[in-house]
């Protein structure tokens, strides 16, 4: 089919990342080079705050044994006993000679082993990335630097904003100098043209304003679509991971004055507020009820009245916020501003879980006299696996008629068996609704007509019957309006579908057509697509896992599925991210690795205007790399049970094939996740490899993302079984390598990774892994939330054996490990401390004591409260050093042994 009108030819649409890298054959590594930045970073900083994370500081390694050169040698750090009585000189000579012979024999055996053709499992397609070229001359990174953000690249967010008259390429900038305005809208192209007639629109001149003597300092801002009023949030307080409350204000651009969103209740905290597409009203939720404020009046209209502790309107409860929408809003305006769709959530039947706070007062209330010594308890409606779920239904508000209504859909799921995962407005009063059954393996897509108040299911997909898998909740479907002049006769939408065992993009038109045009045939899996849609030129932009699963590249495709073209340079193994302007004529391109990240604003290939501006080059980070020595990264595959699994091996600087290195396995491993990627990242694993001198291995095993649904879905109903087998088999492969000390192999993970660490050492029983570390682990999936757990495990009532197998329960096997460590925050609202406490109780009942535990008072799942983040990593590092130094090697005969041979061994620094 011919290209759409206005589309550039394929020859003109060349990759936009040409010459961003150069190769040096001498080290087989990539070295980044680019031009100098030309933009002040202040005006591009994230509209709602910086993305630069900070963390706590490092603690020292302590006063331990050192090698002759003054450096603590952890590459061969066996346990060294301290002390011992003097031995007579002759005995020293004789025993020294005997020990020399023994050591010589051991060395000969080692050499024969090393060069004797020792077999290991085959690996393929090995890729070596080394981002530092200082050799042995560079400084060592410290844990302090890793935790305080010293090694974090500077990243900035551009907030694209649609123009009042359909203009494309407009930026919302915050934090500019007073002379240019605190908040303004600027045309991207005019930034580099001082003679441009398109001048910036200043929305807020100052960084604060006063209302009746109260100074208002914005924490978040949302301009109205017509850019005449700004919705402002101040006094923000965090609720859960994504939700917050605060005071909301309306700021008039022309007069530069503000007023409360609700003048009659200006001090009451609001949970959510959003603009009408007409710019004439704001809908908001307060105390779980919805209200409407029209700008033409100071009065506030009540939309709902019965919201409260158990009934939510327009905002999600805990489990929907965490597991379905990853955000604080379930409110959607129709494009014409005539209707509002929202979820009503009834969690009356959901059991409560108490989260206790022993140090802090999260509710902000002072205890009553005499009750100061009692912990504060916050009760959460938390549906665990198999427990009653919240009842959620979709409702609508007719703005003109001031009326709330709902629409029944014939053949839909029962209330207790329904998850509403996406709502997308189409045109002419139609709305597309995606829902699944409770176990997320049957999908319904319905189209509702709010004008006629009717609805029908237009797509049904049984994912369990298709491949035994599930469907993940997502909010990426994109409505495509009809445009006969450009060949689109009907409305439609773009969605992610399962095609030939992978997630692909598909175009459904008209909206009730169940048979789509698959847009991305033959490509690797798409990632949160589509990323951008150019309606004018008939193009869809998407991010895809590239030639290898650890890559990310950007492509475009026509609406008819023809002419798939790369936007980034796919000849380089790279990791990109992107955000597109509203018309997709411009893109904010982020190169995230493997070399030093950079960011640019560019015109897209089909745009007639050519534009490129560098936003960030991270020159500070590049200079730092020239002074430090980092680990080398080896990307490869291993074959286990017929599956090709991605692996990242981090090797210490000055890696020596003839040495024996301890190995730390690091994993997350959750369904659909990915840990092996090409992002630039100097993290705790980098510290372990580059400073402590250990090898770190990460395996994305079965169940993880971007290696095909066959490998992903095999884990269903039996979490931890295949994933732990993959880690164990990988550890056996590494244990057989000549440069690995098979007696010093450990594994660690956080959250799902904590579960995986425990499940792996449980299944292995000390045969391969000797140590393990689990932070905030799930230990029994009956304790985790229903929406996440049942997606992968079904319900406990349906699959009791699977839940039994997945629980960490084989204490006999755990006792066969040398030692393991468990750490958890006591106020974890996500993975409850119940998991670790019941697990430790099992250990106590079965007289297992080869473990350590550390609880962090009042810390949630991220473990930050009162210096906890620093402690969790420093404790992890110290514990790992102690483990690999043999601190906890079992002594089967603890009776004192004063033999001459033992004392001689102590004298020469050996352990018997």
From Swiss-Prot:
Side of membrane Vacuolar, spans: 114-912
> Mind listing the GO molecular function terms for this protein?
aminopeptidase activity; dipeptidyl-peptidase activity; serine-type endopeptidase activity
Provide ranges: composition bias, Basic and acidic residues: 1-25
Q: Which residues lie on this side of the membrane: Cytoplasmic?
A: 1-92
InterPro entries in the cross-refs? AB_hydrolase_fold, Pept_S9_AS, Peptidase_S9_cat, Peptidase_S9B_N, Serine_Prot_S9B/DPPIV
Pfam families of this UniProt entry?
DPPIV_N (PF00930), Peptidase_S9 (PF00326)
Which segments cross the bilayer?
A: 93-113
First-listed, main subcellular location of the protein, grouped into a coarse class: membrane
Q: What does this protein do?
A: Type IV dipeptidyl-peptidase which removes N-terminal dipeptides sequentially from polypeptides having unsubstituted N-termini provided that the penultimate residue is proline.
Q: How is this protein named in the record?
A: Probable dipeptidyl-aminopeptidase B
Native source organism of the sequence: Paracoccidioides lutzii (strain ATCC MYA-826 / Pb01) (Paracoccidioides brasiliensis)
Organism placement in taxonomy: Eukaryota, Fungi, Dikarya, Ascomycota, Pezizomycotina
